[in-house]
């Protein structure tokens, strides 16, 4: 004989069908969401090595040309240095192949800025302006013969022009006439002018 269900309680088999249907729908929906999430994670595209975050790679210091004091192979104001993804990082290398790095393989080449120099030394220009500026030697050296001759004939504009030129050359405001930059020690004191125009490229932040 089957035991009687206590009075006042509904039998599980006699429970409302809506509750069972709701539980089943929730279970099925959760299963579909989990499968979709797993598929999204598994199907995530491997990033390019140049898109790695800071700290996920390390780049070598550029090799400096002793004569120009600029990175070797500087072309169009740009040079490239080798960068190595950290161990256990997987990304697409230079050839587009998905590679699991160990820390010793080159992942990508990072562009760095460099300057166009044409043989004009900053130290020489400052020295000429300080000691022979009243003769216009600094202006002759930088490729301004007319101003150099004028300073020579006026003894550096009575010294005032020599002082002004010394300040302008020391602050790297006046440079070579051909538009090139001074040869300055790569890790020395350099003046960098920053400006933003309508043509300035703003790189989109790819991660928070």
Swiss-Prot record:
Q: Which residues form the signal peptide?
A: 1-37
Say if the entry is tagged with keyword Phosphoprotein: no
Protein's GO biological process: apoptotic signaling pathway
List where the protein spans the membrane.
Answer: 130-150, 155-175
What does the record say about PTM? N-glycosylated.
- Domain TM2 positions: 119-167
Give this protein's Gene Ontology molecular function annotations. amyloid-beta binding; G protein-coupled receptor activity
| Domain of life assignment | Eukaryota
Q: Does the keyword field hold Glycoprotein? A: yes
Quote a single Gene Ontology cellular component term: plasma membrane
- Please list the residues annotated as glycosylated: 73, 76, 97, 198
Residue spans, topological domain Cytoplasmic: 151-154
> InterPro entries, from UniProt?
TM2 (IPR007829), TM2D1-3-like (IPR050932)
* Coiled-coil stretches: none
Q: What is its main location?
A: membrane
Its keywords, alphabetically, are: Apoptosis, Glycoprotein, Membrane, Signal, Transmembrane, Transmembrane helix
Q: Where in the cell is it found?
A: Membrane
Q: Which residues lie on this side of the membrane: Extracellular?
A: 38-129, 176-208
Bilayer disposition of the protein? Multi-pass membrane protein
Say what the protein does.
May participate in amyloid-beta-induced apoptosis via its interaction with beta-APP42.
Q: Which PANTHER family match?
A: BETA-AMYLOID BINDING PROTEIN-RELATED (PTHR21016), TM2 DOMAIN-CONTAINING PROTEIN 1 (PTHR21016:SF1)
> Belongs to which family?
Belongs to the TM2 family.
Instruction: Share what the entry says about its subunit structure, partners included.
Output: Interacts with APP beta-APP42 (amyloid-beta protein 42).
Record-given protein name: TM2 domain-containing protein 1
């Amino acid at each position: 004989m089957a035991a009687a269900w206590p009075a006042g309680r509904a039998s599980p088999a006699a429970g409302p069908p809506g509750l069972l249907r709701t539980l089943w729908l929730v279970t099925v929906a959760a299963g579909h969401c989990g499968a979709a999430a797993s598929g999204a994670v598994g199907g995530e595209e491997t990033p390019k090595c140049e898109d790695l975050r800071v700290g996920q790679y390390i780049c070598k210091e550029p090799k400096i040309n002793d004569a120009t004091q600029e990175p070797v192979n500087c072309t169009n104001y740009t040079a490239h240095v080798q960068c190595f993804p950290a161990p256990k990082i997987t990304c697409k290398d230079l050839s587009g192949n998905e590679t699991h790095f160990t820390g010793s393989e080159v992942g990508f080449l990072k562009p760095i800025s460099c300057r166009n120099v044409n043989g004009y030394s900053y130290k020489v220009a400052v020295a000429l302006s300080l000691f022979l500026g009243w003769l216009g030697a600094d202006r002759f050296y930088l490729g301004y013969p007319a101003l150099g001759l004028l300073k020579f004939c006026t003894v550096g504009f009575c010294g005032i022009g020599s002082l002004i030129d010394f300040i302008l050359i020391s602050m790297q405001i006046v440079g070579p006439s051909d538009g090139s930059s001074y040869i300055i020690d790569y890790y020395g004191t350099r003046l960098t002018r920053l400006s933003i125009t309508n043509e300035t490229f703003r790189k989109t932040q790819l991660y928070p």
